[in-house]
């Protein structure tokens, strides 16, 4: 028997990827597409290549008969929308940032709004499957992680867990394709602005910084502060991070490989690449995989970790479906058994 799901925000890039994945999921039926601006429009008019013959509606959510609702909406939307009564009717996976951070003051500092739903904020489960699998299985509200956050935490988690690095020495240099900026029209995202151009943005102010710090602090069991700098590169999709950290002791590469293997050998979507094989975005394009590798610079006594994901799949829609699978006791990779599309 299939579960009935709805999507708010299916017109965006992450929302469209969510539709594409769910259409091929054997245990899901897409029953509702919510929109306030596109009511009556058929989804195929918006995305002719997507075989979903369903029109956008604008119903009161309390009227819906759904097992699960995905929210692929702008920040601050779901914080105002969700309530305990709705969560008694259906499960929620929120792809926005509205329930990712536990400290309400972080929303005032980083997102410039006062969180109106602090009780739900404390009850939401952070949907990074590789760290919080058991909690996700029992959750009614899951906060889907950010794209940079997913790649950064997965790349560094074993090092923090084993406490083999100086936590406050960590620097993360991240690069993302333009789809990470969303589908809305912005001058800085026009073809002539991004083509043949690489630029940094969000210097010392990117909103994924507190998210990365919060969950790596939880792993480390102490508050950590790190440096995170994102860059926009002229490609559609993909994230590559290069992370640097000082080693606490004299370790060899096999020592660190053993640590990563210990934590990731049974994970379906994390691929620790062979030595000398460095992650590339094209190897994970349109897939739910995270590719990771590392090297030690014996001269500087630093470990350099590389991670690559597709920002729209493992960094958004694919991870949301992975969370759904856990919440409904499906196989974790159900509907996600596809590889890179070169």
UniProtKB/Swiss-Prot annotation:
Example of a GO MF term: NADP+ binding
Primary location recorded for the protein, binned into one broad class: cytoplasm
Keyword Cytoplasm in record: yes
Active-site residues (renumbered): 147
Localization annotation: Cytoplasm
Key words of the record: Amino-acid biosynthesis, Arginine biosynthesis, Cytoplasm, NADP, Oxidoreductase
One matching Pfam family: Semialdhyde_dhC_1
GO BP term, example: L-arginine biosynthetic process
Catalyzed reactions: N-acetyl-L-glutamate 5-semialdehyde + phosphate + NADP(+) = N-acetyl-L-glutamyl 5-phosphate + NADPH + H(+)
GO (cellular component) term, any one: cytoplasm
Main enzyme class: oxidoreductase
Pathway in which this enzyme or protein is active: Amino-acid biosynthesis; L-arginine biosynthesis; N(2)-acetyl-L-ornithine from L-glutamate: step 3/4
Record EC number: 1.2.1.38
Superkingdom, natural source: Bacteria
Matching PROSITE patterns: ARGC
Record-stated family: Belongs to the NAGSA dehydrogenase family. Type 1 subfamily.
Cited function: Catalyzes the NADPH-dependent reduction of N-acetyl-5-glutamyl phosphate to yield N-acetyl-L-glutamate 5-semialdehyde.
Official protein name in the record: N-acetyl-gamma-glutamyl-phosphate reductase
């Amino acid at each position: 028997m299939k579960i009935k799901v709805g999507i708010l925000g299916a017109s965006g890039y992450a929302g469209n990827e969510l539709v594409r994945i769910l259409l091929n999921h054997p245990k899901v039926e897409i029953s509702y597409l919510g929109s306030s601006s596109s009511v009556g429009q058929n989804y195929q008019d918006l995305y002719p290549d997507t075989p979903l013959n369903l029109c956008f509606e604008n119903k009161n959510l309390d009227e819906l008969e759904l097992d699960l609702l995905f929210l692929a909406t702008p920040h601050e939307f779901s914080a105002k929308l969700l309530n305990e009564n709705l969560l008694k009717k259906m499960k929620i996976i929120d792809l926005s940032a509205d329930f990712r951070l536990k400290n309400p003051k972080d929303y005032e500092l980083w997102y410039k709004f006062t969180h109106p739903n602090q009780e739900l904020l404390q009850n939401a489960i952070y949907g990074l499957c590789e760290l919080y699998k058991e909690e996700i299985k029992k959750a009614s509200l899951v906060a889907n992680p950010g794209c940079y956050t997913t790649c950064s935490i997965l790349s560094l988690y074993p090092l923090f867990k084993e406490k083999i690095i100086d936590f406050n020495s960590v620097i993360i240099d991240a690069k993302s394709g333009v789809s990470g900026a969303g589908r809305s029209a912005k001058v800085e995202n026009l073809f002539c602005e991004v083509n043949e151009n690489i630029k940094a943005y969000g210097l010392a102010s990117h909103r994924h910084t507190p998210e990365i710090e919060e969950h790596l602090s939880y792993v480390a069991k102490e508050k950590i502060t790190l440096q995170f700098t994102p860059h926009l590169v002229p490609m559609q999709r993909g994230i590559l991070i290069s992370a640097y950290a000082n080693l606490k002791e004299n370790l060899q590469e096999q020592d660190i490989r053993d640590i990563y293997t210990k934590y990731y050998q049974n994970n379906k979507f994390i691929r620790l690449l062979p030595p000398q094989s460095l992650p590339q975005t094209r190897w994970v394009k349109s897939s739910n995989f995270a590719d990771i590798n590392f090297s030690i610079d014996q001269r500087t006594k630093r470990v350099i970790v590389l991670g690559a994901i597709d920002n729209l799949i493992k960094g958004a829609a694919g991870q949301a479906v992975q969370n759904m699978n856990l919440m409904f006791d499906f196989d974790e990779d159900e509907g996600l058994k596809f590889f890179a599309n070169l």
